[in-house]
């Protein structure tokens, strides 16, 4: 099953997440099919917090991909801002 979820990057105590399309059996930070955006939880000021390619997310949802809970809330936030 294909899932759209967060993959952690960044350094210790400074998380940065890639929003990726991956097989649900793959490890969290392991192999993925496509990168569709990023999420920076520590963003402040003029720094961009979330960027999501909504066209690609909708494409994968149409092909049966499921969203993780956190990614679903980020997509909803991005759709509201767009």
Swiss-Prot record:
Annotated Pfam families: Ribosomal_S16
Keywords, comma-separated and alphabetical: Ribonucleoprotein, Ribosomal protein
Gene Ontology MF annotations: structural constituent of ribosome
Domain of life: Bacteria
GO biological process: translation
Family: Belongs to the bacterial ribosomal protein bS16 family.
Gene Ontology, cellular component aspect: cytoplasm; small ribosomal subunit
Organism of derivation: Histophilus somni (strain 2336)
Gene name tied to this protein: rpsP
UniProt protein name: Small ribosomal subunit protein bS16
PANTHER family assigned to the protein according to its UniProt record, in alphabetical order: 30S RIBOSOMAL PROTEIN S16, SMALL RIBOSOMAL SUBUNIT PROTEIN BS16M
InterPro entries assigned to the protein according to its UniProt record, in alphabetical order: Ribosomal_bS16 (IPR000307), Ribosomal_bS16_dom_sf (IPR023803)
